[in-house]
Regions:
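One-carbon transfer enzymes
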Residues: 3, 9, 44-48, 55, ...
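Conserved nucleotide-ligand handling architecture
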Residues: 1-21, 25-26, 60
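Glycine- and Gly-Pro-enriched alpha-helical subdomains that act as flexible
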Residues: 111-147
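Short loop/turn motifs at secondary-structure junctions
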Residues: 16-18, 64, 147
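Phosphate-centric recognition/catalysis
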Residues: 47-125
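Intrinsically disordered, low-complexity, positively charged segments
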Residues: 16-55
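Short acidic/glycine-rich loop or secondary-structure boundary segments that cap or lie
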Residues: 30-31, 76-77, 129-132
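Generic secondary-structure signature for well-ordered alpha-helical cores
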Residues: 27, 59-62, 144-147
Length: 147
């Protein structure tokens, strides 16, 4: 279902698991290549515009979400995590109070959980990461007794 610039899937998961994706509309970025709702400071957009776009997201989301620093690789990180920077292309958590967040442009966002909602994972799947096994790596980390 599409509501403004937020898209939510219609999937059968526990009520406390939420997934949303933004589109490129209704934002503050004025350069046409960003299509107005850019959320990344890594692509040459005006930082003020990105901050205004981010404020829109934060006004509709819990305070406890973290962006990872993506690099088109295969690294997976468990949240919450105090290391900085959080360099990975996937994150997961077993904590119901933590939000897994990724950014995508032309890459595939993958969100996975189980029918109990015992974990959630957000995977940034570009062609490089797919070739390096980012999905398999995320599933293996989630299933590992010592992540």
């Amino acid at each position: 279902m599409i509501k403004s610039n937020i898209i939510s899937p219609d999937w059968k998961v526990p009520y406390f698991i939420k997934a949303v994706q933004t589109n490129r509309k209704n934002g503050f970025s004025v350069d046409n290549k960003f299509k107005s709702f850019n959320l990344s400071n890594d692509v040459g957009d005006n930082e003020r515009h990105v901050a205004l776009n981010m404020r829109q997201i934060r006004s509709r989301a819990p305070d406890n979400f973290t962006f990872i620093k993506q690099n088109h690789g295969k690294e997976v990180i468990k949240l919450p995590n105090s290391k900085a920077p959080l360099l990975a292309d996937a994150c997961y958590t077993n904590n119901k109070n933590v939000v897994c967040t990724i950014l995508t442009a032309d890459c595939l966002p993958i969100i996975i959980t189980d029918n109990k909602g015992s974990f959630v994972s957000a995977i940034h799947a570009g062609w490089k990461g797919l070739g390096m096994g980012i999905i398999e790596n995320a599933i293996n980390k989630i299933n590992s007794p010592n992540p």
